[in-house]
Amino acid sequence: MREDICSIPVNDVFMPKDGCPFCRMRDMLEDRMATYITGAAMMEPDVRVETNRLGFCTEHFNQILARGSRLSVALILESLLATVREEVFPQGKVPAKKIVAAAHARQEHCFICENIEKNTAHLLDSTLKLWQTDEEFRQLYSQQPYICLPHYGMVLEAAMKLPRKVFPLFCLLYTSPSPRD
């Protein structure tokens, strides 16, 4: 099996044959992002600007609280709360609609969720390229016990970009009887 910077994380996710590989991919990315944000990244100005702009969903905020050191969490919170205070509790006369929009916007974005989504797209592209070019990987892919329904839709949507001759072969994985049955 080919090993390069794009294939290694994909192969690592597909090697275990336990559950949905794309759920494992999401878990891996989530773990890496939570570790990253509570590590040295908290001192990088460009990362702090993004975390202040996007904030965190409740689930990822709780992960950061549980994982990070007190100092890293305190530094993240200090700048994030200052940004939230300016946007959601502005000084002076600000239309209520603008404040409501700012409060809602804070609930719609998450630094970790958006990075997971972006990185999942890259890893999914790598997965499909490996499936097209590497027979060993096709074998590994076909040995997965299942792909959960949310990820099944995501994978098929991405696979629709495959060449016309390849897409039906890829779909056969899901429509023909499995040797696991």
Language-model features, listed with the residues they occupy:
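Short, recurring structural edge motifs at helix starts
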Residues: 5-11, 40-51, 95-101, 132-138
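Short metal-coordination and nucleic-acid-contact micro-motifs, chiefly zinc-binding Cys/His arrays
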Residues: 16, 53, 103-106, 141-144
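Short recognition patches in nucleic-acid-associated and regulatory proteins
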Residues: 25-47, 117-138
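Cys/His-rich microdomains that often coordinate metals
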Residues: 27, 63-64, 117, 155
